[in-house]
Amino acid sequence: MQAMDSATSQINQLSERIRAAASDKTPLRICGSGSKDFYGLRLQGEPLSTRALSGIVSYGPSELVVTVRAGTPLAELEATLASQGQCLAFEPPHFGEGSTVGGMVAAGLSGPSRASVGAVRDFVLGLEMINGQGELLPYGGQVMKNVAGYDD
């Protein structure tokens, strides 16, 4: 329960910082480890790190479902999956040891298997994000497996 309270507190702090920046019209640069800073346009604004929002929330190997936070190192997720003989089928590229799950999803980069298995976006069942106004928005959600397949 303490981990959940900590995550809720961190999310509230991020939301408040984003609301304040929106009110002041201060640009923010959302970042995890910064491993993809070279990718795309040059980033500007005050850094807002998601690194503290880290950890694997839940993992059901038999259900093939894992819930992780944005700041979770990609290597940590892959090691957890490998311990159960599983992997990320879309083979996300690593741009440094600190690459995070949030960066993987935000950049949408997939490896050579993308053509046959799909991209990272095809494996995301749901997410919660904070928009530019500091509001927490849920998309998708938890799924439960029944005998016919997956249902919300």
Question: Where on the chain are the PLM-derived regions?
Answer:
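Glycine-rich N-terminal segment of FAD-binding domains in flavoprotein oxidoreductases
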Residues: D5-F95
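FAD-binding subdomain of flavoenzyme oxidoreductases
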Residues: E97-D152
